[in-house]
Amino acid sequence: MSYRKQRETKETAIDIRMDLNDNQASSINTGVGFLDHMLTLFSFHSGINLQINVQGDTEVDDHHTTEDIGIVLGQLLLEAIKDKQSFTRYGAFYIPMDETLARVVTDISGRPYLSFNAEFSKEKVGTFDTELVEEFFRGLVINARLTTHIDLIRGGNTHHEIEAIFKAFARSLKIALSDDGSKGVPSSKGVIE
């Protein structure tokens, strides 16, 4: 099933199409090269096809673009989760990226919460401010109503640190979204909102 959302503010114009069942190559153009790279990795490792086109005020900096993409992706994920008939709910994954190690644990709980425990080795990767990684995930997690714990266990090269986090999140989400074969909501309450 395909989901699409367009969002326009005075800072960004975002158009994202997301498909959980389409293994075609994604097309990602955010205007922020490093973010394009991370979202391409996220798409590949989660199995979620993304078509992203963004016009943002990157002449100011990359903050609005990065945060707003996280918000829209979270909103699209929430729509997809509500439509799923069966899913595992929980996912956890470790990713080693050479010298770095990241762990991400995700619960499709309906209770939005992000624990972000990562201190990056440097403040920038190229022109990308590393503090924006947390802003991206906060926007995504809160809007998708996930409970997610992100931990950078071992650091090293800053690019590797961030890449390990994006890949671990993608894999944990893929597990949480996977069909567990049961019918109904994976909660003893009978509902996840």
Curated annotation (Swiss-Prot):
Lineage: Bacteria, Bacillati, Bacillota, Bacilli, Bacillales
UniProt entry keywords in alphabetical sequence: Amino-acid biosynthesis, Cytoplasm, Histidine biosynthesis, Lyase
Record-listed E.C. numbers: 4.2.1.19
BP terms from Gene Ontology: L-histidine biosynthetic process
Gene coding for it: hisB
Gene3D superfamilies associated with the record: Imidazole glycerol phosphate dehydratase, domain 1
Name used for this protein in its record: Imidazoleglycerol-phosphate dehydratase
Top-level EC class as recorded in UniProt: lyase
Keyword Lyase: yes
Listed Pfam families: IGPD
Catalytic activity of the protein: D-erythro-1-(imidazol-4-yl)glycerol 3-phosphate = 3-(imidazol-4-yl)-2-oxopropyl phosphate + H2O
Pathways involved: Amino-acid biosynthesis; L-histidine biosynthesis; L-histidine from 5-phospho-alpha-D-ribose 1-diphosphate: step 6/9
GO MF entry, a single one: imidazoleglycerol-phosphate dehydratase activity
PANTHER family: IMIDAZOLEGLYCEROL-PHOSPHATE DEHYDRATASE, IMIDAZOLEGLYCEROL-PHOSPHATE DEHYDRATASE HIS7
Protein's UniProt keywords contain Cell division: no
Family recorded in the similarity comment: Belongs to the imidazoleglycerol-phosphate dehydratase family.
SUPFAM superfamilies, sorted: Ribosomal protein S5 domain 2-like
One cellular component (GO) term of this entry: cytoplasm
Compartment(s) where it occurs, according to its Swiss-Prot or TrEMBL record: Cytoplasm
HAMAP family the record matches: HisB (MF_00076)
Principal subcellular localisation of the protein: cytoplasm
